[in-house]
Amino acid sequence: MMQIDWRLYAVLDTATLGSRDPLAMTAALLAGGIGVLQLRAKNLSVRQTAQLAQAILPLTKIAQIPLIINDDLGLALAVGADGVHLGVDDLPLDLARASFKGLIGYSPEGVADAQRAEKLGVDYLGVGPFAATTTKLDAGAPLGQAGLRAIVEAVDCPVVAIGGIAQHNVAEVRACGVAGIVVVSALLNATNPTQACREFLAHYKE
């Protein structure tokens, strides 16, 4: 399995992207140094999402980073993606692990759920929202440092923080012991996404 740099995990959210070219955005994010790319395409059909994933995969393969499909294990298997990210309402984790050898990420609802997911074999946890976010309207109440740290300390697998993360609070997030940060709108809506990636990574290293 490839070595994964979790520090900057980008989500290519097609709803946030709007009419902009997803392949051009992917190239810009890769040029900026992201370590993981998730494709989240809730506003597209399965066919459209599959076609987009197939177009993105050669780019992520060249960059040697994983492409993770949001929610849909069947689609991840069909296109040969490196991973899938699941939530509490998606396919049960034990079934996912039994049928998929790639990366499985999970968004837990609290410490006990995070520990349960780790026992079922997930590879990483996406925990949030850290702060208030408008990207995912059903994200729930912000965890803040205390809530995030509680989950990080309760598991051994990598934890990436998501939700309301901007350059000004990267240090707060990193102080919780996370493996990395997940950024959506602050990258996709940046004037220069490549530069925005580099700035996030610079803040993460500070």
From Swiss-Prot:
<feature type="binding site">
    <location>
        <position position="107"/>
    </location>
    <ligand>
        <name>4-amino-2-methyl-5-(diphosphooxymethyl)pyrimidine</name>
    </ligand>
</feature>
<keyword id="KW-0784">Thiamine biosynthesis</keyword>
<feature type="binding site">
    <location>
        <begin position="38"/>
        <end position="42"/>
    </location>
    <ligand>
        <name>4-amino-2-methyl-5-(diphosphooxymethyl)pyrimidine</name>
    </ligand>
</feature>
<dbReference type="GO" id="GO:0004789">
    <property type="term" value="F:thiamine-phosphate diphosphorylase activity"/>
</dbReference>
<feature type="binding site">
    <location>
        <position position="71"/>
    </location>
    <ligand>
        <name>Mg(2+)</name>
    </ligand>
</feature>
<dbReference type="InterPro" id="IPR013785">
    <property type="entry name" value="Aldolase_TIM"/>
</dbReference>
<dbReference type="InterPro" id="IPR034291">
    <property type="entry name" value="TMP_synthase"/>
</dbReference>
<comment type="pathway">
    <text>Cofactor biosynthesis; thiamine diphosphate biosynthesis; thiamine phosphate from 4-amino-2-methyl-5-diphosphomethylpyrimidine and 4-methyl-5-(2-phosphoethyl)-thiazole: step 1/1.</text>
</comment>
<dbReference type="GO" id="GO:0005737">
    <property type="term" value="C:cytoplasm"/>
</dbReference>
<feature type="binding site">
    <location>
        <position position="136"/>
    </location>
    <ligand>
        <name>4-amino-2-methyl-5-(diphosphooxymethyl)pyrimidine</name>
    </ligand>
</feature>
<dbReference type="Pfam" id="PF02581">
    <property type="entry name" value="TMP-TENI"/>
</dbReference>
<feature type="binding site">
    <location>
        <position position="70"/>
    </location>
    <ligand>
        <name>4-amino-2-methyl-5-(diphosphooxymethyl)pyrimidine</name>
    </ligand>
</feature>
<dbReference type="GO" id="GO:0009229">
    <property type="term" value="P:thiamine diphosphate biosynthetic process"/>
</dbReference>
<comment type="similarity">
    <text>Belongs to the thiamine-phosphate synthase family.</text>
</comment>
<dbReference type="InterPro" id="IPR022998">
    <property type="entry name" value="ThiamineP_synth_TenI"/>
</dbReference>
<dbReference type="GO" id="GO:0000287">
    <property type="term" value="F:magnesium ion binding"/>
</dbReference>
<feature type="binding site">
    <location>
        <position position="90"/>
    </location>
    <ligand>
        <name>Mg(2+)</name>
    </ligand>
</feature>
<keyword id="KW-0460">Magnesium</keyword>
<feature type="binding site">
    <location>
        <begin position="184"/>
        <end position="185"/>
    </location>
    <ligand>
        <name>2-[(2R,5Z)-2-carboxy-4-methylthiazol-5(2H)-ylidene]ethyl phosphate</name>
    </ligand>
</feature>
<dbReference type="GO" id="GO:0009228">
    <property type="term" value="P:thiamine biosynthetic process"/>
</dbReference>
<protein>
    <recommendedName>
        <fullName>Thiamine-phosphate synthase</fullName>
        <ecNumber>2.5.1.3</ecNumber>
    </recommendedName>
</protein>
<feature type="binding site">
    <location>
        <position position="164"/>
    </location>
    <ligand>
        <name>2-[(2R,5Z)-2-carboxy-4-methylthiazol-5(2H)-ylidene]ethyl phosphate</name>
    </ligand>
</feature>
<keyword id="KW-0479">Metal-binding</keyword>
<feature type="binding site">
    <location>
        <begin position="133"/>
        <end position="135"/>
    </location>
    <ligand>
        <name>2-[(2R,5Z)-2-carboxy-4-methylthiazol-5(2H)-ylidene]ethyl phosphate</name>
    </ligand>
</feature>
<comment type="function">
    <text>Condenses 4-methyl-5-(beta-hydroxyethyl)thiazole monophosphate (THZ-P) and 2-methyl-4-amino-5-hydroxymethyl pyrimidine pyrophosphate (HMP-PP) to form thiamine monophosphate (TMP).</text>
</comment>
<dbReference type="InterPro" id="IPR036206">
    <property type="entry name" value="ThiamineP_synth_sf"/>
</dbReference>
<keyword id="KW-0808">Transferase</keyword>
